[in-house]
């Protein structure tokens, strides 16, 4: 791994960790439920990308599979939360 790539991956890890912390703060302090749902989606994306960057840094494919599971769980939870906010129930 070149020093430039190592620096870029380290910087990306810190930036994504900061984004995840700020999204978690937005979940706790969001004034409306819609803000909390968007912050949850941002948290899922930041966590997924953090797993991918860490997998690139470690050179292991196992974290990519974990990132895929996080992406699917994030999609399902976002769709169900949006449906609940829109109609007031998830299952009709």
UniProtKB/Swiss-Prot annotation:
The GO annotation for biological process reads: potassium ion transport
Origin, by domain of life? Bacteria
Question: Where can this protein be found?
Answer: Cell membrane
A GO term from the CC aspect? plasma membrane
Membrane-protein topology: Multi-pass membrane protein
The answer, when asked if Transferase is one of the entry's keywords, is: no
Q: Name one GO molecular function term.
A: sodium:proton antiporter activity
Membrane-crossing ranges are 4-24, 37-57, 62-82
Per the record, the major location class is membrane
What keywords are assigned to this protein?
Answer: Antiport, Cell membrane, Hydrogen ion transport, Ion transport, Membrane, Potassium, Potassium transport, Transmembrane, Transmembrane helix, Transport
- One Pfam annotation reads MrpF_PhaF
For whether the record's keyword set contains Cell inner membrane, the answer is no
Role this protein plays: Part of a K(+) efflux system involved in pH adaptation.
Name the family the entry cites: Belongs to the CPA3 antiporters (TC 2.A.63) subunit F family.
Q: What is this protein called?
A: Probable K(+)/H(+) antiporter subunit F
- Which organism encodes this protein? Rhodobacter capsulatus (strain ATCC BAA-309 / NBRC 16581 / SB1003)
């Amino acid at each position: 791994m070149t020093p430039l790539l190592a620096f870029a991956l380290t910087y990306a890890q810190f930036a994504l960790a900061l984004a995840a912390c700020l999204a978690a703060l937005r979940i706790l302090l969001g004034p409306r439920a819609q803000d909390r749902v968007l912050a949850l989606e941002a948290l899922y994306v930041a966590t997924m990308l953090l797993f991918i960057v860490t997998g690139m840094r470690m050179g292991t494919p196992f974290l990519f599979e974990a990132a895929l599971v996080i992406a699917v769980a994030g999609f399902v939870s976002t769709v169900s939360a949006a449906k609940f906010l829109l109609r007031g129930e998830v299952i009709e």
